[in-house]
A protein has these predicted regions:
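Glycine-rich phosphate/pyrophosphate-binding loop and the adjoining helix
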Residues: 84-170
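Helix-loop-strand module that forms the ligand-binding subsite of alpha/beta enzymes
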Residues: 1-88
Length: 170
């Protein structure tokens, strides 16, 4: 984390993306986001009030990942301004056993006997709504940054949201 530490501090915003493995983000991204804890109690001089975009892609969808990323950002009082979720190809499409495996994604999504073809292989490039959501997220992030968002206001709003969340859980 040491080489990335200053990059996190210097960044105006974050675009965090991860694959969906078993309804959660992969371990590498999870470990990276856990390391943000070192900034948590440093008041507004490091990460508080910054902006983020969360991106998740999975064999089914990326929504569980975007929700997790948003959660990590919230704990650090970083506002997630957009979440982009898409469907990518599960590893079953390339493992070599996808057409015959009875417990894999090919069998579950398309039924027994399905042949893997380019036409049925999911890819975010084939999902115009996902690609547009990514473009829109980038534009919104650029707009917010160019308008000089107030980090203190963002941090205060994020703190309030976190306090409300904890009130509901007690």
């Amino acid at each position: 984390m040491a080489p990335l530490r200053e990059k996190f501090v210097e960044a105006d915003a974050f675009v965090i993306a991860a694959p969906n493995y078993f309804s959660g983000m992969n371990a590498s991204t999870h470990a990276l986001l856990e390391r943000l804890y070192q900034f948590r109690h440093r008041e507004a001089d490091t990460l508080w009030g910054k902006l983020a975009v969360a991106i998740g892609v999975g064999g089914g969808d990326g929504l569980p990942v975007t929700d997790q990323i948003e959660g990590f950002m919230g704990y650090n009082f970083i506002e997630t301004i957009a979440k982009v979720s898409g469907q990518g190809a599960a590893c079953c499409f390339t493992c070599g056993y996808g057409e015959t495996c009875k417990v894999g994604a090919i069998h579950m999504f398309f039924g027994p006997g399905t042949k893997i073809t380019e036409e049925i292989t999911p890819a975010v490039e084939k999902q115009p709504e996902v690609m547009q959501a990514a473009v829109d997220a980038g534009k919104e992030l650029g707009r917010r940054l160019s308008e000089g968002h107030d980090r203190a206001t963002v941090a205060a709003r994020m703190q309030q949201q976190m306090m409300e969340k904890y009130k509901k859980s007690t």
